[in-house]
């Protein structure tokens, strides 16, 4: 087989066409902006189609093209499914001016009128149960395809689910996605067991599963299924169901809703790194059935399966699609039968927020994020790229981390149970519009060393014990990067796990968080593998 055969696809068309010029698009308006890039609505001149152009910002040009963008581009070009966002092409803008030496890059997506988060913020939008079932089936079909091809999304949330006025839902934002090494999930067997360590610097806090909060490194596709459960409940309530303002508060809300961990409902929880020094979280059964009592027993049953504390027994996408919830009246609506709504992107949502009733205060906490002028807006002073790559942290930061560890072990049980339950005991309780106005809670910031239980850097005795308990080699942590050629060693580093929280399909916003909530992982040199991507869609659950 000659090289020439790679230049044409199976239909004889050109396989690699390079980047389109930005002059091929007519800009129609701005949809949103954030730390990852700016997003514009545009019209393709060659065929008149409406597209979204996501401009990739180069905050540190000397570091080269952002690794998160490289990951997203590679995976999206390999994936092909009705419920997965399609990357049509890349566009380049070359400036003739002397002040701009490097071109600007744009990712070109089909235009989608909404993201799920925006629809839920629109006070004029109310989902019927048939509509919720339709969206859930499409979400589960997309995840079934992803997990069946050994891909973890790792940022499942309402803002990353795009919806068109034709009723089609698509999973977007693959900046944190990566292949996993284990076998794909099998019917009736959950997500299986992970055989290696992955970074815990993933998933937006409000949708983060308990095993990640407790620093489990050997996680599986079950982390995405927890996010599906959070989205499912959010569609019923019209607001995030677990909106914690810190990792500690997030765990409190989870345990108030689904019960505190025990060796029966979450075996091995006390051995996880995040539980060092914690003997118990009290003994509460949870009140999920009470919070969602208006949704009926079948919806509660599916929610219970999706929000299981034990990640080994959490339902996978294959089995979730077979749940009786989807075959009981009202049956799922067809996508084409769903109503259409006015556009709901970032700039549109600002108007919706002004229409919402007064709500409780926004979550508190430190602030880490990019300000409008590109600088770090943080309570702890400036933050540079060099700092994010430094494997050491200051003694002051370690001291604060130890205080956070003490909060887990020393805070009176009654106090956190009472505070966590206040948000959940009232089904009609409203969340502050500023929860969204200030952006969703962030993806984890650039890695720093985790210091809850130790002031030592890199591998401690605790880390070695953890690796031995779970049977894995030390330092075998997630550092997936796209398999591009070249000898640039910087491309072998996992630098892009969480520098920003994307606020939707095409864009993201600055966020507020404490950089002590997260741990430092040790990068390795693992290369990617391209799975066999084939679309397999079962439309059986839809109403005929």
Swiss-Prot record:
Q: Name one Pfam family in it.
A: Pkinase
Specify the protein name. Answer: Serine/threonine-protein kinase bur1
Q: What is its main location?
A: nucleus
Superkingdom of this protein's organism: Eukaryota
- Origin organism is Emericella nidulans (strain FGSC A4 / ATCC 38163 / CBS 112.46 / NRRL 194 / M139)
The listed locations are: Nucleus
Supply the enzyme class, top level: transferase
Where the record annotates domain Protein kinase, the positions are 25-326
Q: Where is the composition biased (Basic and acidic residues)?
A: 419-438, 456-466, 488-511, 532-544
Q: Which Gene3D superfamilies match?
A: Phosphorylase Kinase, domain 1, Transferase(Phosphotransferase) domain 1
> Corresponding gene?
ptkA
Example of a GO cellular component annotation carried by this entry:
nucleus
Keyword presence, Endoplasmic reticulum: no
Enumerate the residues binding ATP. 31-39, 54
Molecular function GO terms recorded: ATP binding; cyclin-dependent protein serine/threonine kinase activity; protein serine kinase activity; RNA polymerase II CTD heptapeptide repeat kinase activity
